[in-house]
UniProtKB/Swiss-Prot annotation:
Superkingdom per UniProt: Bacteria
Reported function: Negative regulator of class I heat shock genes (grpE-dnaK-dnaJ and groELS operons). Prevents heat-shock induction of these operons.
Gene Ontology biological process terms, A to Z: negative regulation of DNA-templated transcription
Disulfide bonds, paired cysteine numbers: none
Species: Mycobacterium sp. (strain KMS)
Gene: hrcA
Protein name (database record): Heat-inducible transcription repressor HrcA
Length: 347
């Protein structure tokens, strides 16, 4: 790339920075005064004319200034050499705030609230997807001799509790045997494999001559409940925070704010964007029509995945106007995702 192209990119970068900060169209005189571009106002005007002709900036209404287009923002983001990481104090504060969450729900609620505050955008966090989860532990508790509580804990920290009504009461020895059998069948397996294993266990034991009818019945009833829990309870869940941040920037959406809010409420578009995040640590920025959703055409969506030990739990990110502090948003999304994974990975 020649020096003229490099210089024009510096002009574009200055226009993006000033427009994000001020919301005002940027003129050549303002750029020369605010930035050490090393060239005259006339040269900057010429560079702006080229940038406009190539579709990187545009002139809104009758203003003398220019604003970035989607293409301009994309060029700016693609050429971010290095996103400045958060300070050690900021990182410690994020980790401490998330670590005090008492369970998965609390950690994710804290994360979405924190990310919305840090970015001043709408924050979105996807609950760990069940399809990628494994059973960490199964606990079986006798509420009464004929009524059991099954507690399934996944490696992502998700906890599901189910009640099993038995046909016949079982004693302490049979309860311990039931706990061992179910635990051996489930623990360490992906949820889909675990559901098959527990179903096979029930089938195998139903005709076992060494198994009491009461215990075989308890295994069968427990297996039915567990299969429903592991396989059928697969709805995707999203947490949203900071929706009010969008209403503070209504002008940025050009009358499309209602459709953005409707898309967030319906969740389908957001879940599709998050589902594309398969690599923790990689941040994806979709600008305007890159979201491939007409309702979101006036937005930018910054997403990543969170997880632990190389395993992705789910996606997260922010939704805001295209007039966004991209370097700061990318840094905050990456940091919060990293520490969600750390916190959940140690539980």
């Amino acid at each position: 790339m020649g020096s003229a192209d490099d210089r024009r990119f510096e002009v574009l970068r200055a226009i993006v920075a000033d427009f994000v900060a001020t919301k005002e169209p940027i003129g050549s005189k303002t750029l020369v005064e605010r930035h050490n571009l090393g060239v005259s106002s006339a040269t900057v005007r010429n560079d702006m004319a080229v940038l406009e002709a190539e579709g990187y900036i545009t002139q809104p209404h009758t203003s003398s200034g220019r604003v970035p287009t989607e293409k301009g923002y994309r060029e700016f983001v693609d050429r971010l050499d290095d996103v400045k990481p958060l300070s050690s104090a900021e990182r410690r504060a994020i980790l401490k705030f998330l670590e005090t969450g008492v369970d998965l729900d609390d950690v994710l609620r804290r994360a979405v609230r924190l990310l919305a505050q840090l970015t001043r955008q709408v924050a979105i966090v996807q609950y760990p997807t069940l399809s990628t989860s494994s059973v960490r532990h199964l606990e079986v508790v006798a509420l009464t001799p004929a009524r059991l509580l099954l507690v399934v804990i996944t490696d992502t920290g998700r906890v599901d509790q189910r009640i099993v009504e038995l046909g016949d009461a079982i004693d302490e020895h049979e309860l311990a045997t039931l706990r061992d059998l179910l635990g051996q069948a489930l623990e360490g397996k992906r949820l889909s494999a675990a559901s098959v294993a527990v179903s096979d266990l029930a089938t195998h034991l139903s005709g076992s001559p060494g198994m009491s009818h009461r215990l075989a019945d308890a295994v069968g009833r427990s297996a039915t409940v567990l299969v429903e829990t592991l396989v059928e309870h697969t709805e995707e869940r999203l947490l949203l925070g900071g929706t009010a941040n969008l209403t503070r920037n209504t002008a940025d959406f050009g009358g499309s704010l209602r459709s953005v809010l409707e898309a967030l409420e319906e969740q389908v578009v957001v879940l599709r964007l998050l589902a594309a995040q398969q690599e923790a640590g990689k941040v994806t920025v979709r600008i305007g029509h890159e979201t491939e959703a007409e309702q979101m055409a006036g937005t930018s969506v910054v997403t990543t995945a969170y997880g632990s030990s190389g395993k992705v739990y789910g996606g997260m990110g922010v939704v805001g106007p295209t007039r966004m502090d991209y370097p700061g948003t990318i840094a905050n999304v990456a940091a919060v995702a990293l520490y969600i994974g750390e916190v959940l990975g140690t539980r």
